[in-house]
Amino acid sequence: MRLEDLARVINPSEAGGSLALEIEGLYCDSRQVRSGGLFFALRGVATDGHDYIVASRDRGAVAVVVEDPSRVPEGMTWLKVDDARLAMSRAAAAFYGNPTDGIPVVGITGTNGKTTTTYLVEAVMARAGIPVAVLGTISYRFGDKTIPAPHTTPESVDLQRTIRDLVDRGAQGVVMEVSSHALEQRRVDGCRFDVGVFTNLTRDHLDYHRDMESYFESKARLFTELLAADDTKPRRAAVINVDDPYGARLASDAVAPVVSYGLSPSVMVRAEMVTFSVDGISGTLVTPLGTIPFHSRLLGRFNLYNILAAVAAGVALGLSPDAIRGGIEGDVRVPGRLERVDNDHGITVLVDYAHTGDALENVLKTVAEIATGRIITVFGCGGDRDRGKRPVMGEIAGRFSDLSIVTSDNPRTEDAGAIIGEILGGIRSLGLREYGAEELITGFDAKGFAAVESRREAIRLAARVARPGDVLLLAGKGHEDYQIIGTMKHHFDDREEVAAAFRELSSKGQG
């Protein structure tokens, strides 16, 4: 693609050098630049891409997009813009032929529920006969091709390249999780969304965003800017959970028609006569398409909201009631989201990604609704992340569990013991009994907590303490198959660990 064609998309305020250049690739990492590349000098928190312009030229970049042209070496073509990230997002879409044009694209954002909602929307669209590609927290997938997801939302060049590849393979629709980081950093500005879905907003990522209002403003961009109708997609929709206070705010600011969902009688999509059990959720959906009876194998009230989000997205896309019902009633299995781990000890073992206070509370409330025995929770908090949520999560675990075992999550470069100490501050505020690990081996008779730094040992202890009828919840890591200690990733999978713990107990004739 010629630089002059990209320049029409980027719309630079100034330019220097020849625009009659053939561009072979787009890059924002100088180490990846190849011959004929266009380099985008992005300013980041820790680095400034302007410092790597010379390195990009030496690796073959023929032009550079900058915010400060004084940093460009003599003889190199440059384009000056106010926002290099926005320019890269638009250029990436054009370079890869605007792959989101002409197909339905659903973007899902919010603190909790994005991944499950993505799976549900995928199922609804697939039931409508649309071959769907999915870009999510867990994986990017289409058909029989699945690749692990390095980020919730990749950088704009990687995103557009991936979507182009998926469309070329036959995808006729795209469902993607859209993170607050991606919205703030303009990674998805080159995508043309048909539907945006807002699930909820609770405390998270405050290590990156200054405060909750900044976090909200990042999420809101999808609805206040990116859903504006244009010639390519004149009919767009904002699907919003208006039971959430931030969602209610967003509904009044959205630039697209709103399809509201929730449990209040005034919303467009809601559920009535709902029952929750170990078998799932049953009830009646009330929609603009009429009432739809349903049963889902998913568990809990928060998953009811995820179901409603998917139903509302189906309504917004103009899909049939049969497709909507068929999608949500299908065998939707979401890795690490209240995922069951089978065992022969009569214990309900659930693995969940809940890593915020709100998510943990939702999961534990769900467990409490279906549990017939005690609730044992094993969890920790990630290092180099928002410290403020640690005591909050500790207090929540202590309040809703019969036994909380606090352990390491991904400590990263922090001391695992120090993180555990901050979590324990929240639990101790409840005045619960503190158990030693050795003491728990013989069981426990009063609501309480313990600290075991090794996650493997914490899981083994929980398996040993649990008895038939109990629910054992392993929270925080979910689908992850690694643990980050220092700067190194080590293989670690909660599902594998708890299964191994029960096998060991069986081999010893225990349980």
Curated annotation (Swiss-Prot):
Molecular function (Gene Ontology), one example: magnesium ion binding
Cofactor(s) of this protein: Mg(2+)
GO terms for cellular component: cytoplasm
Reactions catalysed according to its record: UDP-N-acetyl-alpha-D-muramoyl-L-alanyl-D-glutamate + meso-2,6-diaminopimelate + ATP = UDP-N-acetyl-alpha-D-muramoyl-L-alanyl-gamma-D-glutamyl-meso-2,6-diaminopimelate + ADP + phosphate + H(+)
Gene Ontology biological process terms in this record: cell division; cell wall organization; peptidoglycan biosynthetic process; regulation of cell shape
Main location: cytoplasm
Domain of life the protein comes from: Bacteria
Residues reported to bind meso-2,6-diaminopimelate: 385, 409-412, 476, 480
Disulfide partners: none
Pathway given in the UniProt record: Cell wall biogenesis; peptidoglycan biosynthesis
Binding site for UDP-N-acetyl-alpha-D-muramoyl-L-alanyl-D-glutamate: 30, 152-153, 179, 185, 187
Subcellular compartments: Cytoplasm
Residues that bear N6-carboxylysine: 219
Post-translational modifications: Carboxylation is probably crucial for Mg(2+) binding and, consequently, for the gamma-phosphate positioning of ATP.
Motif (Meso-diaminopimelate recognition motif): 409-412
Gene3D superfamilies, per database record: Mur ligase, C-terminal domain (3.90.190.20), Mur-like, catalytic domain (3.40.1190.10), MurE/MurF, N-terminal domain (3.40.1390.10)
Keyword set, alphabetical order: ATP-binding, Cell cycle, Cell division, Cell shape, Cell wall biogenesis/degradation, Cytoplasm, Ligase, Magnesium, Nucleotide-binding, Peptidoglycan synthesis
Residues annotated for ATP binding in this entry: 110-116
Xref: InterPro entries: Mur-like_cat_sf, Mur_ligase_C, Mur_ligase_C_dom_sf, Mur_ligase_cen, Mur_ligase_N, MurE/MurF_N, UDP-N-AcMur-Glu-dNH2Pim_ligase
EC number(s) recorded for this UniProt protein: 6.3.2.13
Family: Belongs to the MurCDEF family. MurE subfamily.
Stated role: Catalyzes the addition of meso-diaminopimelic acid to the nucleotide precursor UDP-N-acetylmuramoyl-L-alanyl-D-glutamate (UMAG) in the biosynthesis of bacterial cell-wall peptidoglycan.
HAMAP family, per database record: MurE (MF_00208)
Protein name as it appears in the record: UDP-N-acetylmuramoyl-L-alanyl-D-glutamate--2,6-diaminopimelate ligase
Organism of provenance: Geobacter metallireducens (strain ATCC 53774 / DSM 7210 / GS-15)
Gene behind this protein: murE
